[in-house]
Amino acid sequence: PSGVITDGLGFMYNGCMAVFDPRPGRAGSIAPGKARFSSLCPTLAFKDGQLRLAIGAPGGTQIAMGVTQAIINVIDHDMSMTEAVSAPRFSSTSNLIDVTNRIPRYVQAELEADGYQVFRKPNTFDIAAVHGIRVTEEGWLDGGADPGHDGVAIGV
């Protein structure tokens, strides 16, 4: 978020002007009436017609990467929702691979040895702020909120 609130409106503006290209005449340049792209991806996942997962995140260009990794953690690695949203994440929205500070340094070294450019983020939770609720096979609600950000996941 931008941290900017207009008196009387009661909401905070987003901070996505940063994703525009400041150079004129390019596809992502700032121009009157031009909308920015959106990486919003609120997601509902079903199994045999039953809701099993509701998940989403704020986080600008990092949203899709964060949400995707948390979904993979739940479905493929059988993690609880708290484990899934707390696991280390990476992102690659350009030629650079961004890794959070909790990705082991040997992983970064192996990627760099293979010719990838890697940027280590100084923060431990810096790729989207994923929150979700998993519905277990027994019908229990299992919520998880990214521990690096404000928020809570509550099933009612």
Annotate the PLM regions.
Residues 102-156:
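Cofactor-centric catalytic regions
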